[in-house]
Amino acid sequence: MRVLLAPMEGVLDSLVRELLTEVNDYDLCITEFVRVVDQLLPVKVFHRICPELQNASRTPSGTLVRVQLLGQFPQWLAENAARAVELGSWGVDLNCGCPSKTVNGSGGGATLLKDPELIYQGAKAMREAVPAHLPVSVKVRLGWDSGEKKFEIADAVQQAGATELVVHGRTKEQGYRAEHIDWQAIGEIRQRLNIPVIANGEIWDWQSAQECMAISGCDSVMIGRGALNIPNLSRVVKYNEPRMPWPEVVALLQKYTRLEKQSDTGLYHVARIKQWLSYLRKEYDEATELFQHVRVLNNSPDIARAIQAIDIGKLR
């Protein structure tokens, strides 16, 4: 089976990819989206979102990374897709699933689900702009406010020449509500298409991954939020390994505070450590206590000192 690390805007950036791929066995990471409007973006934009481009499109530990584009105009998606692969990206991905109001308001992400023809035109333009030996993938949801167009959406992706399709098993309107996950619908799409379909949504552990694959028939999954809840989730999902012990999680957080974010204004670690702890609290009781301690801290040095002060030896 393949396990992919999902793109999560404002969460899974290059530093977190570096940390997570060191302790996991991901087959591929997809970047946060590069927003494409009406121009060919400068090289520095791609390098900011995906610094791994300067390392043969791999994280420091060797996991492949693919640049994701978000936009609606085929010409500019094509030109920026070509630039991404020229810079070294291992293929490109088209975002047709992001539910963010800001993104949808500008005509990108899940908005494309309303009109599968836009998905077809965007993916086709990207496919034609990218050398045939490199993959072009598309990430979608089941629809905007219903699943009525799910087959039309899937057909558009395949007919555009995409290499593979990632399906999040909910509509845009359903957001991330657990009760709405529909792995069966993903399976219906998989049966319809000839290209590989990757299942996404509500995969939190080995059992849920097995259930998802059994219901959908997919042999590959993409995980997002769960990868932050359990930092070694790909190994849990692939090999039924136990979740990472809390002392190892703390060591990961300590390393995170030592990594420098390029062009950081001094608030990067403040926001991101608190954000990560809020995910960890769902799996580790110890994270709640640590979160209560750091949530009142408002600058990176204080956050770093608080995390670094934890004696891992006493946790074992």
Swiss-Prot record:
A molecular function (GO) term: FMN binding
Keyword Ribosomal protein: no
Top-tier EC class: oxidoreductase
Keywords: Flavoprotein, FMN, NADP, Oxidoreductase, RNA-binding, tRNA processing, tRNA-binding
Extent of the signal sequence: none
Reaction catalyzed: 5,6-dihydrouridine(16) in tRNA + NADP(+) = uridine(16) in tRNA + NADPH + H(+); 5,6-dihydrouridine(16) in tRNA + NAD(+) = uridine(16) in tRNA + NADH + H(+)
Enzyme Commission numbers on file: 1.3.1.-
tRNA processing found in the keyword field: yes
Active site: C98
Domain of life: Bacteria
Pfam families: Dus
Required cofactor names: FMN
CDD domains the UniProt entry points to: DUS_like_FMN
PROSITE patterns: UPF0034 (PS01136)
Site entry: Interacts with tRNA: R35, N95, Y176, R272, K274, Y279, R295
Binding site for FMN: P7, M8, E9, Q68, K139, N200, G201, E202, G224, R225
Function recorded in the entry: Catalyzes the synthesis of 5,6-dihydrouridine (D), a modified base found in the D-loop of most tRNAs, via the reduction of the C5-C6 double bond in target uridines. Specifically modifies U16 in tRNAs.
Family: Belongs to the Dus family. DusC subfamily.
Stated name of the protein: tRNA-dihydrouridine(16) synthase
Organism placement in taxonomy: Bacteria, Pseudomonadati, Pseudomonadota, Gammaproteobacteria, Enterobacterales
